[in-house]
Amino acid sequence: MAKTSMKNRELKRQQTVAKYAKKRAELKAIIANPNSTPEARWEAQVALQKQPRDASASRLRNRCRITGRPHGVYRKFGLSRNKLREAAMRGDVPGLVKASW
């Protein structure tokens, strides 16, 4: 089990990313636009750098919803491999069955 502080930190990062997503996309569009002036690009880069580090989506980490485990997490279910297996064996995941051949 991950520490509660790690889970809370990740939750705070998700909220920060959501808060700055629109403004960040606008600034990145200005930077990527070949028709924008060099001054506008420079101002956009400076404004982007002044945003919090955690506003970047690349700082997010997928964690298991139950345990908070950072590795071996299936995106489709939001569970780590261990908890997904347990849930599948109990029949909690509709349509997911153990393979047999």
Swiss-Prot record:
Keywords tagged on the record: Ribonucleoprotein, Ribosomal protein, RNA-binding, rRNA-binding
**What's the superkingdom here?**
Bacteria
Name of a matching Pfam family: Ribosomal_S14
Q: Which GO terms describe its cellular component?
A: cytoplasm; small ribosomal subunit
- The answer to whether the entry has keyword RNA-binding is yes
Q: Write out the GO MF terms.
A: rRNA binding; structural constituent of ribosome
Q: Which GO terms of type biological process are on file?
A: translation
**Function noted in UniProt:** Binds 16S rRNA, required for the assembly of 30S particles and may also be responsible for determining the conformation of the 16S rRNA at the A site.
Subunit note: Part of the 30S ribosomal subunit. Contacts proteins S3 and S10.
The family this protein is said to belong to: Belongs to the universal ribosomal protein uS14 family.
Name of the molecule in the record: Small ribosomal subunit protein uS14
Q: Which organism is it from?
A: Ectopseudomonas mendocina (strain ymp)
Question: Gene of origin?
Answer: rpsN
